[in-house]
């Protein structure tokens, strides 16, 4: 079972690949399994609560459990003591040892397989059992993070940054191309810092140009940080033919005071000028960002600055989150903690401001002919449902294609087809195959 982000998902797929290679029978239905591996999330309190609910539910079914991932890395031995059904814990840098852990369990051992300082990063040689469907795959280009944002525990959970070599990443991309992947999504904690630890400088632009020769129609980049979007990187976005002009930028806030409290001083006064530069160099850019409201010390003035920033910048997509106080982070001990009700009200206001912007952005696509990657058929509404370059999986909207008898027999899940966009609402587009 997989909980949490797509980086966790890749780890889960590697564990499944190893189990499959080791001769174990895999089921995605826990009721059919004698032992359940749960790859957990511990990023924020809500994620921990979800992980614990799942674990308790399995324990109540008398399932033997292996607890893997961030929750195991975070709480370690405490989990084994509090959940008797847990036969092992596996840390974020230890999932490659899943077969050895199982063998030790079979010999009656309770296993603690957690490295305090994770150093492992998977590569193209590690078996992988993909769960995202034939057409879409995530590719982890690095693991860990060297930053110390005041609100974040990721460096403690996943260790310092470890980049894969360009050759390794391209090799896996070619493997995925042979499997029929149409969309490849590059992920790490900070994709724009890729290569800094390995090559002594950020090498995302070099990597993107190498991936331009891979026979995958769409390559999408997630988790790009502002300072890493140099003119060289933007030039690669402009020139690499299969690289989508989709920029996922976790800006978090706009006001310099809040950014300083977040320990993101490198971003001060950068946001607006950065976005203006990107728009001039990459006019077709699609912008997604994530924002945190209710951060300790965020005043009404700070929040109004963020409101103005959202209104001015006109992002295509925004994810808004209320601050979650995490033990062990600098932000947890900051003065002037914001009441939850105030943070929720601020979140709701940002969402209400963004919604008409998002709808207008969608409406601007009416009349365009775009490629759509078909992901499922909705027989109830007589539509094929997919995505165009504007929408990333899980976080954005869909394109709903009205089924035309002329083309119905030519369409299959996992294929790309040109479509004329004929309508738009707050979240989705509608279109017709052409």
UniProtKB/Swiss-Prot annotation:
Record's keyword annotation contains S-adenosyl-L-methionine: yes
TRAM domain ranges (all copies): 363-434
Cofactor: how and how many bound: Binds 2 [4Fe-4S] clusters. One cluster is coordinated with 3 cysteines and an exchangeable S-adenosyl-L-methionine.
Enzyme class: transferase
Cofactor: [4Fe-4S] cluster
Residues that bind [4Fe-4S] cluster 1: 5, 41, 70
Record localization: Cytoplasm
Domain MTTase N-terminal: 1-107
Keywords noted in UniProt: 4Fe-4S, Cytoplasm, Iron, Iron-sulfur, Metal-binding, S-adenosyl-L-methionine, Transferase
Catalysed conversion reaction: L-aspartate(89)-[ribosomal protein uS12]-hydrogen + (sulfur carrier)-SH + AH2 + 2 S-adenosyl-L-methionine = 3-methylsulfanyl-L-aspartate(89)-[ribosomal protein uS12]-hydrogen + (sulfur carrier)-H + 5'-deoxyadenosine + L-methionine + A + S-adenosyl-L-homocysteine + 2 H(+)
Entry's EC annotation: 2.8.4.4
Main location: cytoplasm
Record GO cellular component, one term: cytosol
Family of the protein in this entry: Belongs to the methylthiotransferase family. RimO subfamily.
Function in brief: Catalyzes the methylthiolation of an aspartic acid residue of ribosomal protein uS12.
Name by which UniProt lists this protein: Ribosomal protein uS12 methylthiotransferase RimO
Organism: Prochlorococcus marinus (strain SARG / CCMP1375 / SS120)
């Amino acid at each position: 079972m997989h909980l949490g982000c797509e980086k966790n998902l890749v780890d889960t797929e590697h564990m499944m690949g190893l189990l499959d290679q080791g001769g174990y029978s895999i089921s995605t239905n826990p009721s059919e399994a004698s032992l359940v591996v749960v790859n957990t999330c511990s990023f924020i309190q809500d994620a921990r609560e979800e992980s614990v609910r799942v674990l308790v539910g399995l324990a109540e079914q008398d399932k033997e459990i292996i607890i893997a991932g961030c929750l195991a890395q975070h709480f370690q031995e405490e989990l084994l003591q509090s959940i008797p059904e847990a036969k092992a814990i596996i840390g974020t840098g230890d999932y490659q040892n899943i077969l050895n852990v199982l063998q030790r369990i079979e010999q009656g051992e309770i296993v603690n397989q957690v490295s305090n300082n994770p150093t492992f990063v998977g590569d193209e040689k590690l078996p992988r059992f993909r769960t995202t469907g034939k057409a879409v795959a995530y590719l982890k280009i690095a693991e860990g993070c060297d930053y110390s944002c005041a609100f974040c525990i990721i460096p403690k959970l996943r260790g310092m940054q470890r980049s894969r070599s360009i050759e390794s990443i391209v090799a896996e991309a070619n493997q995925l191309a042979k499997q029929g992947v149409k969309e490849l999504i590059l992920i790490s904690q900070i994709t724009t810092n890729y290569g800094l630890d390995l090559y002594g400088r950020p090498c995302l632009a070099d990597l993107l140009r190498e991936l331009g020769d891979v026979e995958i129609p769409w390559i999408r980049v997630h988790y790009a940080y502002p300072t890493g979007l140099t003119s060289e990187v933007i030039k690669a976005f402009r020139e690499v033919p299969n690289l989508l002009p989709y920029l996922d930028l976790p800006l978090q806030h706009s006001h310099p005071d809040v950014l300083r409290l977040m320990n993101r001083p490198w971003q001060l006064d950068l946001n607006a000028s950065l976005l203006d530069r990107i728009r001039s160099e990459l006019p077709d850019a699609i912008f997604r960002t994530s924002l945190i409201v209710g951060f300790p010390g965020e005043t009404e003035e700070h929040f109004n600055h963020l409101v103005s920033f959202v209104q001015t910048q006109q992002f295509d997509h925004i994810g808004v989150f209320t601050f979650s106080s995490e033990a062990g982070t600098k932000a947890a001990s900051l003065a002037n903690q914001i009441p939850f009700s105030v943070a929720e009200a601020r979140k709701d206001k940002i969402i209400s401001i963004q919604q008409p912007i998002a709808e207008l952005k969608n409406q601007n696509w009416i009349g365009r002919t775009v490629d759509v990657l078909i992901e499922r058929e909705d027989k109830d509404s007589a539509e094929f449902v997919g995505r165009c370059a504007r929408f990333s999986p899980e976080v954005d909207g869909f394109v709903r294609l009205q089924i035309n008898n002329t083309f119905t027999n030519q369409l299959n899940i996992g294929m790309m087809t040109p479509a004329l966009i004929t309508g738009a609402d707050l979240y989705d587009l509608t279109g017709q195959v052409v």
